From Swiss-Prot:
Residues binding heme: C148, C151, K152
Cofactor dependency: Ca(2+); heme c
Residues annotated to bind heme c 3: H119, C228, C231, H232
Recorded name of the encoding gene: nrfA
Function according to Swiss-Prot or TrEMBL: Catalyzes the reduction of nitrite to ammonia, consuming six electrons in the process.
Record InterPro entries: Cyt_c552 (IPR003321), Cyt_c_NO2Rdtase_formate-dep (IPR017570), Multihaem_cyt_sf (IPR036280)
Descriptive protein name: Cytochrome c-552
PROSITE patterns the UniProt entry points to: MULTIHEME_CYTC
PANTHER family per the UniProt record, alphabetical: CYTOCHROME C-552, CYTOCHROME C-552 RESPIRATORY NITRITE REDUCTASE
Organism: Porphyromonas gingivalis (strain ATCC BAA-308 / W83)
Amino acid sequence: MKNKERKLKSWQGWLIFSSSMVVVFCLGLLAASVTERRAEIQSIYANKKDKIAPFEARNEMYRGNYPREYETWTYTADTSFRSEFNGSQAIDVLEQRPNMVIFWAGYAFSRDYTSPRGHMHAIQDMQRTLRTGNPGIDGAGDMQPATCWVCKSPDVPRMMQAIGVDEFYKNKWSSLGSDIVNPIGCADCHDPETMDLHISRPALIEAFQRRGLDITKASHQEMRSLVCAQCHVEYYFKGEGKYLTFPWDKGMTMEDAERYYDEAEYYDYIHTLSRAPILKAQHPDFEISQHGIHAQRGVSCADCHMPYISEGGVKFSDHHITSPLAHMDRTCQTCHRESEEELRKNVYERQRKANEVRNQLENELAKAHLEAQFAWDKGATEKEMTPILKYIRQSQWRWDYGVASHGASFHAPQEITRILSNGLERAMQARIEIARVLARHGYTDEVPLPDVSTKEKAQKYIGLDMDGLHKNKEKFLETVVPKWVKKAKGKGLLIAAK
């Protein structure tokens, strides 16, 4: 019995010894692999091929030192991704939802509004949109200030350094056409020398300062969202100098921004049909995302829109900034264990429900504008219309704040539904008050509304000569833009053929 026990113990000892040797061998391989990968990473950063100058805006200059990041950045030119709700291709939103033409009567967005493409298209899309007009063609001047360039190019910080921030904003859009030529890229988010994340646009820094906050104390994880917040926010052009300003002084909710604008008696345009003083929301992506569960749990923009890629011993951020639905295995499924199909269904469900409210709001708001026009024509007084125009202004602000934000119905579905529902209530209230005004003026029938069921019909109704606008834009693209490109190349500002 004792001999048998000794044999068992001996056998067990050899098993333990052999297992230990295998474990030690595997640990050795792992240590060697880790050391090799660390050496590979250190080699990449220690042996940079090119010295990059401060304010270097040419994205191609970063390719030698950061080939992986550069290559994935070039994929932002790809427009093949599709989802149930748009994707990375330019879609004519006015064609899909012609009521928006009515909302923007008297404003450039009624001419042209498409869903955004990737960052590499930023300059080209700015030049092509009808919203920037055709300066220099048949004596036409600028429709927009140079402030419109601020979020389109890493040339912007370079020019701000060269001529000053105030002077940059004061310029006309076309005056910087040969200087703002490289699309959104490296220097917008990175210090060219250290490649640390940095804030290159003064408006975000100034917004923090006015709230008593120091943006330089932000953590690296916070910076992975704040570099996006330089542009993906609500803003306006303040005063005669068109100074880019974020309306965050009173807080970062929709109501806070509205209160800021109301106290400043600010409006973007007077609606040519209803005569309401309208606010045009930009794209309050950052503000709205802060109301969502992901941001509240510390998830950054880059975590989902720039997921990590491992290549050999290198882990780097994918600079193909796009919808997380395009790479769900590297975005959603790094935290969530459900299938892609289930997760995609969850996203679409949130978007569909928000869009139900949005569609109701758009129908009511369009009628409110048209019925207000009818009331004016029937002799309504300014005193009678003032509270109605306030409802319309509030309704459209809530609509625009909700729909202008990219991905809002996913980032913060409860907040977006709240905002849109609030806007719907105000549009309906405006229509009720219009009916009362009309009744006082002896009109009690249903208001006859024009046929604005298509983009073409709506644009014709508000008085746009679309054939002329397109013709002049074509002349602009054929004559003015090539001169900008030639001049930029002559100054050494542009490398790639564009």
